[in-house]
Amino acid sequence: MASNRKLSGVLKGRSVAGIHAVPAGRGVVVGFDDGSQLTVKTAGDAPLPAVTGRVRAVRQSGTTLCLDLEPVATLQLETLEPTASVMVRDARGVLEYAD
């Protein structure tokens, strides 16, 4: 699975504070300790794994998106589409990344 260098650069060092579903099976929101949020459009209801940790890297292949966390964990999400499914906003709601 290839590294998503751009998204890795945006998220590296942020700690996962919580994960919740977007209503009506429209996606997942990963909240970080700095108040920023990663929103991922998913195909229907996605399982919500209970993982925490600091983002080390992000990998992506097709519709599979993996956040590699420290010390040793991976948050794997299935996106709705290979592109146009991921967005990151900072604590003020300013767009930092969109794909």
Model regions and ranges:
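Surface-exposed, interaction-prone regions used to assemble/regulate multi-protein complexes
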Residues: 1-99
